[in-house]
Structures are given as structure tokens and as C-alpha cells.
């Protein structure tokens, strides 16, 4: 039992550290950053989902990950936001980590994901 409790404590600590590494951004904050053209948004839901509907201006991570550095702004302090399906999806971390490893220091995630974005009445755009 003691080993199990130790395992849980370590696991929760790791999750807390990980969540702190890429802070959450609210839908309203992201919407404002988009309207002010102060954010690069990365969709991590896969190309098929991206084609069906994504946050306006978002990059398709599946298609762009090989040349992500060229897709991101020159300013390493610029806001970069990654998102996936919703609150239980952790796929966003691949893009967030990739941006972080490229030297970006203001990387956040939209934990609400595309489902929360749509549920809040925000618009999406489709890709050809």
C-alpha cells in the first residue's frame, strides 16, 4: 500500500509539473489574441479533423511538424497555443513540446480544445 501511495504522489506531482509547463489559455483570451493577431495556433487533431474544421488561422500540426520552425514566428517570445480535441485529450503536448524545444517561451494550451471552442459558439474554418 505504501508503494502505491508513493506512486500516486509521484504521478500527481508529474502531472502538476507538466500542466504548469504549458499553462491553459481560456477561449476568450485566445479569441482576443487571434483578433489582435498576437498568436500562432497549432491544431493537433490530425489532418482529417483539421480539414473538417479548425480554429481560424490554425496550423495543421500533422502536415507541418517536419517544418514547424518555418511556420512559427521569428520572435521566440511570441504566444503559441496548441490544442486538440478537448479537456481529456493530451495530444496537444506534442506540438507544445515541439515549439518549446524550438526555443519558444510563451507556449500555452487550450484545454477546452476544438470541442469547447465549438460549444462556446466560436467559428471554425475548413481546409480544402
Question: Which residue ranges define each predicted feature?
Answer:
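Extracytoplasmic copper-binding redox domains, predominantly the cupredoxin/blue-copper superfamily
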Residues: 35, 46
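Rhodanese-like catalytic fold shared by cysteine-dependent sulfurtransferases
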Residues: 2-7, 17-28, 39, 48-82, ...
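Repetitive helical segments and hydrophobic/amphipathic motifs
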Residues: 11-12
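Structural scaffold elements adjacent to functional motifs in cytosolic proteins
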Residues: 41-43
Amino acid at each position: 500500500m505504501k508503494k502505491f501511495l508513493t506512486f500516486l504522489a509521484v504521478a500527481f506531482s508529474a502531472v502538476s509539473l507538466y500542466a504548469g509547463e504549458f499553462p491553459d489559455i481560456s477561449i476568450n483570451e485566445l479569441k482576443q489574441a487571434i483578433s489582435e493577431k498576437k498568436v500562432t495556433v497549432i491544431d493537433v487533431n490530425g489532418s482529417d479533423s483539421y480539414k473538417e474544421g479548425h480554429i481560424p488561422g490554425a496550423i495543421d500540426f500533422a502536415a507541418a511538424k517536419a517544418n514547424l520552425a518555418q511556420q512559427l514566428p521569428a520572435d521566440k517570445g511570441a504566444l503559441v497555443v496548441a490544442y486538440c480535441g478537448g479537456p481529456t485529450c493530451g495530444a496537444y503536448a506534442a506540438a507544445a513540446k515541439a515549439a518549446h524545444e524550438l526555443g519558444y517561451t510563451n507556449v500555452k494550451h487550450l484545454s477546452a480544445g476544438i470541442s469547447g471552442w465549438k460549444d462556446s459558439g466560436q467559428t471554425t474554418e475548413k481546409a480544402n
